From Swiss-Prot:
GO terms for molecular function: preQ1 synthase activity. Its main location: cytoplasm. It catalyses: 7-aminomethyl-7-carbaguanine + 2 NADP(+) = 7-cyano-7-deazaguanine + 2 NADPH + 3 H(+). It holds the Pfam family QueF. This is NADPH-dependent 7-cyano-7-deazaguanine reductase.
Length: 125
């Protein structure tokens, strides 16, 4: 797959994730996205979160500008926090075919309650 978003000032937010070849599958890669926003599916109120992605590559690395643009597509979407962790996990697994991947969403407190949800994928041996 060609990288079309990195270095492209015209790149638009969409749900496509770009990857690149990575030879060292023993690496453990962590990505923190600290400026995520979406909306409550019931009230429409904005929610802010940090999203952490931990993965062991299965031959592909995640290009981070495409991830940034992917995450921007949720800005106006109403979604439950628990569903978000699984949706992002499934999309990343489809793009990367990793050995292991965990997505953790840590939402800021609203009404005095903070929520964190994790969703993990492990490749079958």
């Amino acid at each position: 797959m060609a990288l079309t978003k990195l270095g492209n000032p015209e790149a638009k937010a969409d749900r496509s994730l770009e990857t690149f070849p990575i030879d060292d599958t023993s690496q453990e890669i962590r990505i923190d996205c600290r400026e995520f926003t979406c909306r409550c599916p019931i009230t429409g109120q904005p929610d802010w979160a940090t999203i952490r992605i931990d993965y062991r590559p299965g031959g592909r690395g995640l290009e981070t500008k495409s991830l940034k643009l992917y995450l921007e597509t949720f800005r106006e979407e109403g979604i439950f926090h628990e569903h978000l962790a699984t949706l992002i996990r499934d999309d990343l697994v489809a793009a990367l075919a990793p050995v292991q991947l965990t997505v953790t969403v840590n939402f800021n407190a609203r009404g005095g309650i903070a929520l964190a949800a994790s969703s993990t994928y492990r490749r079958e041996a």
